[in-house]
Amino acid sequence: MSTMTPLERTVAALTFKKPDRVPVILYFQSGVQHDVQELDYTWEEVLNHPRKLFQVVELQHTKYGADNFFLPVDFRVEGEALGSKLDYMLKCGGGMRMGVVSDWAVKTPSDVKKICIPDPTKAGRMPVILDVIRKLKKKYPDVPIAGFVNGPPDTVADVLEGRYKRLYVEMAKKSSFIHDLLELCTQTSIAFAKAMIEAGAGAIATVEGGMVDEAVSPDQYAEFVVPYHRKIRDAIGALGVPYIYHQCENATPFMDLIVDGIQPALVAFHDSVDLKWAKEKYGKKIAIAGNVSVSKSDAVLMFGTPEEVMAAAKKCIEIGMPGSGYWLSAGCEIHHGVPPENIKALVKAAALYGVYK
Amino acid sequence: MSEKLFKEINDAVVVGDIDEAGRLARQGLADNIDPMTITEKGLIPAMAIVSEKYDKKEYYLPQMLLSSEAFYEAFNILKAKLKVETTGRGKVLIGVVEGDVHDIGKNLVKIVLEANGFVCVDMGRDVPIEDYLEKVAEVHPDFLMLSTLMTPTMLSMKRTLEGLVEEGLRDKVKVGVGGGPISWDFCKKIGADFYGDNEKDALKWVESIVGKK
């Protein structure tokens, strides 16, 4: 029996108070594609039209029962606002085409100086996101909205020709313009985050997608990742808004840097992390979320039945819920390979197994 | 004299000094040293050192990719002077599957295979299934190597295998798969021949098929 609104539930869990049940907080990304198709839209339409995007995002709560709204539902907003161009050409099933960067804003180091921090009320698709957040806030004041900003290195990969490969090589060369570019991307995310908060977002969520354990060392993480996320965290923290951090792949080698250096309000764990280890080691110091498998070849959310999803979610809940400070979540984004009934199974599991006495 | 150059070019690749690696390759040619010998004694051992450092976590992707750039700077200069050998130790068709644009892992496999005498036909990333099928029919590779980093695009890998069967090409090529979400289980499920966790696994596999030099 629900006795709290999604907002009350989510905040209670985040702040280690006792919620009525474990909240289900999801990073919806290409997983909304099922609904985009049902509404007979293309990705290009839905990402560029506020009314269409609103219709799709609204379903995250009304259809699937998540305790939050999550948007943008793609990763390219900052890159596009900084001047990169998208083409809708990446096939992702059902004849749908996602946007990918086809022309990068930064080709040479000197290009960095030519780019200004974009105005979120005007640049690229940022105004679309802000408009949808305002509408969601007005219609669903009791459902928290997580505004998503790209991790600064991920935005660099969207604006720098050569993508991550070039970023990695320039890091190894110790090219100073990479820090200039990271700073520009950080300030862009801060401006966007502040605008989303003003529009009604109650939290800012982020992902570090390319700086993963198999790619970079803890020292590189400390230099190229931590200080930039910390700036975003501090800027929104000054407004009283929590920073929700997801590290793709195995966060284990970086956890101390994340918890002590970035100091987010919550870390959402990827499939690769042992949730029990995370809860025991960090669960009193920081709120955690996770991590029903969604991104490995045996991922239950993608390939399992709803019953199997519920069983996996039950295991996570049993680890996470004692002492509060826990959101039930998928191990990564909800992508288009996840069947809708499996998303609903997560919510059903929280209602069945996640009730606090 | 040659030994000194091999050592210097080796060092240049290991530390990722692109300009120096290129300069030494040109100097080697100017000194009339056989380009294949420079490759075998200078470049290939260098990438072995880099790979070892990566395994020991002394190097991570940034250093490894920088060394790869230095390798290619020298290798491309030398390759232009090598006697044309169309198949090397074996021909490998390699690419990232349709729907995925992450190609760093694929590139690392390619460099190690090329450094060890395999000829790679690089299909790039986000490659339509039909393009793989056409290319397999056209160039008759010994191996097809498919990569994906993302879970949703694992389906493209499966469909590429299905396409090979439908077109009657499956028994003409050995298929290896790899990438973040891929596993042996998945490899078996889709009917591929081999799964590798990294570039060394890939090299071991193709060498086990063609026989070591």
Q: What are these model-predicted stretches?
A:
Chain A
Residues V106-K113:
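Residues forming anionic-ligand binding surfaces in small-molecule and nucleic-acid pockets
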Residues E44-Q55, T62-Y64:
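Short, structured active-site "lid" loops
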